[in-house]
Amino acid sequence: MKALKALAVATLGTLVLAGQAHAQAQQPIKVGVIFPLSGGAGPQGQHVTQAIQAMATIINESGGVMGRPIEILSRDDESTPAVGVSRANELISSGVSVIIEGWNSPVTLAMQPVINRAGILDITAISKADPILSGEGNPLAVRLNSSNSQDGAVIAKYIADSKAKRIAFLTENDAYGNGAQEAIENELKKMSYAYEKVAEEKFPFNQADFRVALTNVRSANPEMTIAINANEGLGMPALIRQAKQSRLPGQLVTAVGTVAPSVISVAGDAANGVIGADIYFPDVEPFASNEANKKFVAKTQEMFKYTPDKYMALGATSLQVWAMAVNEVKSLDKEPVANRIRGGSFNGTIFGDVKFAANGQLESNHKLFTVENQKIVVRPVSN
């Protein structure tokens, strides 16, 4: 009788443990997402968050991550470093396995050491400042968007190819904006390209009135004005409209990745003729025929009635690559997942077959474009 009781207790214990293991296996994996959801960049941050939710749905429909569903926990950083740090701490306390963040470089740079100390993988989707990958705030940093250095080479080449000599800068006065301008000028110097910087105007991220700055630039009679403004919801559309109203001479060239369809929608006809460059266009090859991209675009349109732009694609790909890495290394731990991504290659992403540099930077292909009839028209590749 005692033996039977012992066997029954042991069997019950085994069943309880098995039930607990099964319950744990079915518990969602929490993914933290931090972007501006209010203020000037709020609309874009909301779109990026929606894109990540669309990708989470695609992943969950395909079996999830290590057999578990993904749950997205989203927070608003309000484009403010201190708020971003607070939101990061909230997500850390909530038990997230990874945090996908980064619209504004100053916010990303403030959050990095906090997330790193918590032992959680931090993936920067969009913020561009070069120090993000310096290793100071996060020795295992990963970034999807192109860097200021990569972008600077693209804009510098366009300046040189255009043979423009009188150059003006309208630059956001923070880590992103100053770094972007510095990268362009450094590349021009490397090319030994002779030019004159006829005007330079700096402004804060939240500025929306550029009339005084544009008056100063206009009086310098530039052949080309480089506009560096990451406030796509408010600042960049306002700058484009006011540049048109001021009859700014020469070409208006925008920093890489700062003119999306949402910017053109707000700027209206004033956007026609603007030059820009980017790394993703949903309906242009090689993206148009990419099955992973087609699936992502269709799911985003189904869920949110919106065609994704570059920012949304970067957010979704951040989650997609993380999920691929976790499923491969079979661990949620920061170090093995980060080491799989940094210096690694991934096939079948939204961006196609991709490769990350050893420092965590996704390698990108840039395309120049012109805005015509309020549409982005990709320019032919020049040698």
Question: Residues of each region from the PLM?
Answer:
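Cleaved targeting-peptide boundary
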Residues: A23-I29
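Extracellular/periplasmic Venus flytrap/periplasmic-binding protein
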Residues: V85-S86, D130-L133, N138-R247, P286-E291, ...
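Extracytoplasmic "Venus flytrap"
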Residues: I29-A51, R75-A82, W103-N104, L170-G179, ...
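Extracellular/periplasmic periplasmic-binding protein-like sensory domains
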Residues: I240-A316, E372-S382
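Segments of small-molecule ligand-sensing domains
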Residues: K299-M312, V321-K375
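Sec/Tat signal peptide C-region and signal peptidase I cleavage site
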Residues: L17-A23
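Bacterial N-terminal signal peptides that target proteins for export
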Residues: M1-A8
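Beta-alpha junction/loop-to-helix N-cap segments that form part of ligand/metal-binding clefts
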Residues: P28, P43-Q50, I58, V65-I132, ...
